[in-house]
């Protein structure tokens, strides 16, 4: 199929998810027409909600403004991808944690904190820091600091909530909780990946 295309084309794949990038819209439309038939030969189908054609790249923002719209975005591997500009005004791609992934991660933290709230504080700290470290290692992208900081702050609140529920009579005030955090600090958010950027029709 690729030799029949007008311009450049690329595929980004992970497991059964993939992004097809095309230099020209005509190529993208051609592949979108042919792909379902190719899949049928192998007993496969395209996901109706995930399969769509969008303009994404250095010209997308300008073209969207002409139509009074915002550039389209797409979700892939737990991130929302957005058209953006660097400090020097060049096109780049920004990512942020998908809201549903953020909620899922926080629910897992809350469920764990509830179940193990009676364990010693230092043991809870070690496990929570391991969970935070794993979150930062995956989501710690240069343009995603706001999201991982939001995750950290919510985890701090969740931990206080469940530590407070194990005390009888005297609630765990923020002042007392601040002392616990100084003695047993939670891992601060940090960027763990180098900067990358790209763009085209996707």
Predicted regions and their residues:
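Non-catalytic terminal/accessory segments
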Residues: 1-202
């Amino acid at each position: 199929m690729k030799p029949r295309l007008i311009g450049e084309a690329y595929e980004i794949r992970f497991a059964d998810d993939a992004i097809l990038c095309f230099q020209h819209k005509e190529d993208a439309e051609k592949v979108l027409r042919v792909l379902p038939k190719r899949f049928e030969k192998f007993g496969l189908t395209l996901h109706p909600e995930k399969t769509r054609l969008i303009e994404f790249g250095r010209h997308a923002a300008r073209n969207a403004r002409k139509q009074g719209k915002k550039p389209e975005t797409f979700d892939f591997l737990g991130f929302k991808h957005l058209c953006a500009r660097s400090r020097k005004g060049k096109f780049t791609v920004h990512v942020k944690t998908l809201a549903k992934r953020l909620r899922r991660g926080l629910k897992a933290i809350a469920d764990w904190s509830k179940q193990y709230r009676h364990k010693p504080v230092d043991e809870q700290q070690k496990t929570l820091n391991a969970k935070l470290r794993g979150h930062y290692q995956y989501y710690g992208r240069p343009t995603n600091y706001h999201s991982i900081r939001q995750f950290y702050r919510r985890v701090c609140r969740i931990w206080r909530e469940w530590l407070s529920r194990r005390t009888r009579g005297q609630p765990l005030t923020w002042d007392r909780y601040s002392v616990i955090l100084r003695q047993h600090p939670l891992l601060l958010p940090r960027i763990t990946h180098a900067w990358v950027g790209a763009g085209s029709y996707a």
